[in-house]
Amino acid sequence: MFRFRNRSGSRRVPVPAAVGTRVGTDDGFRAVVDTRSVVQPLGSGHRVEWWVAGEDRWYDPSTEAAVRQVRPGAAPVLETRLRVSGGDVVATTWAAVGRGSTGPAVVVELANETPVPVAVAVAVQAVSGGQVRRISADGRRLLVDGTTAVVVDREPGRYALVDAAQDLWAMVSGGGAQVEPPRSVRCRIGAAAGALVVPLPHRASLRFAIPAADLVENPSASFPDADRVAAGWTARLVDAATVDIPDGVLSAEAPRALVDLQLAKPTAVGAVELARWGLGRQAVETLAATSDPAAERLVAAAHLWRLHRNPAWFEGPSGLPLEDLVRAPADRVEAAGALGVLADLLDARGEARSAADAREAAAGVALASLPPTDPPTTTLRYLSDCLAWESIDGLDLLTEMPDAWLGGGIEVHGLATPHGRLGYAVRWHGDRPALLWELDRWDGRPVVLRVPGLDTAFSTDEPSGEALLAAPAGRVPPRSVAASPPDGGEFF
């Protein structure tokens, strides 16, 4: 959340918060953390942020230049560093479900890496377009309209509550916060705000939690730490396809995008990308939960079948309701293309007559594509298209081969394709690439593999093997990259 200063020195003219990183839990609780560590629970009208009183002055991450945020791994765990006099104050932010009946919350842990004590103000204010009509302090909690908005892990040293006639930042930074908890503040226009000011010794840390519902427990004792949450997300990706390419940034984006898709609003195209990247169970759950148009849901179901050929996904109470999907679409053209693909599924279910009807309805109609609609699906689709593009008779591997990738190793494991699960690797012998591949085909039909980004003359219909390709025409790998011999192995 960025703010402008007006000429009188009062610093607040609210502007809409930038889109940030979603964090959340399995029960549907979601919040957005922006690049300055401001947390907004989705569906609420308020945000929670923090300010730091250093030796020289107060610092607000939303307006300071020296703020750096990183996402160390695939998990939605963020580290935001604010430079203050003498060192950094570091905020680590994640979402977790508390022990017992605590429920879900966003947890923020602030670590004081400076050699001196600081004070931290944990502030609650209305978001742009939102309202806070009543705010009150209750010990370690701030309540918005009677519901817990934030809880700190220790007794505050000071409190500040304001209405529209006062500025919360001005009160806190000007020393106006008071020792005793003030009476609750009401504001008809929804501009009430408040802060808890907490001392933070040097080399120490504190936690606060932004809960989904009322919370009275101590955040430091109630929620798992960030490392445990990150390990949980890593376990969720154990079945996902993996890629290792010379572009390390792009390699890291794939698992992050898979996590982000599981926290995003369920969509049909999101379900397809989860399936393409090996997360079948999550794909089925996403497609079952989406409210996208019926035709898109049917098309997505057809793509899921093409990518995995798993009849169990369409059976039982936890499976996709095939009959409902088939009956619902108003767009008969899109439906026909999807039905043609699902005919094989109907055969597998022993519904030969329905399968024949589906093939007849789909005569001459191809399965529609579902274009990406957001950053995670765009990233995953772009990368999968580069790594394995469906051709008229098989798969084209490495359709794009940037010069920066030449000479670097490439590994792909467990990517789902319409022809089977695919894995391959590229190793280099000087300026010549060696390709190792394995395609676990869905059926016995031949699948032609090509590598147009490396050797346009190469093709094979063998399901597995290795081959030394020709040197890329007119392109020389960097001499600094050591050649490595092809090494066999499994890709799944």
Where are these regions (language model features)?
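Terminal accessory carbohydrate-recognition/targeting modules of carbohydrate-active enzymes
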Residues: 1-255, 280-283, 368-380, 384-385, ...
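Helix-rich, typically C-terminal accessory recognition domains appended to large enzymatic cores
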Residues: 341-345, 350-364, 380-398
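A short hydrophobic/aromatic micro-motif that marks alpha-helical segments and, especially, helix-coil
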Residues: 128-129, 287, 359, 366
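Substrate-binding groove/exosite segments of carbohydrate-active enzymes
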Residues: 184-188, 232-349, 354-360
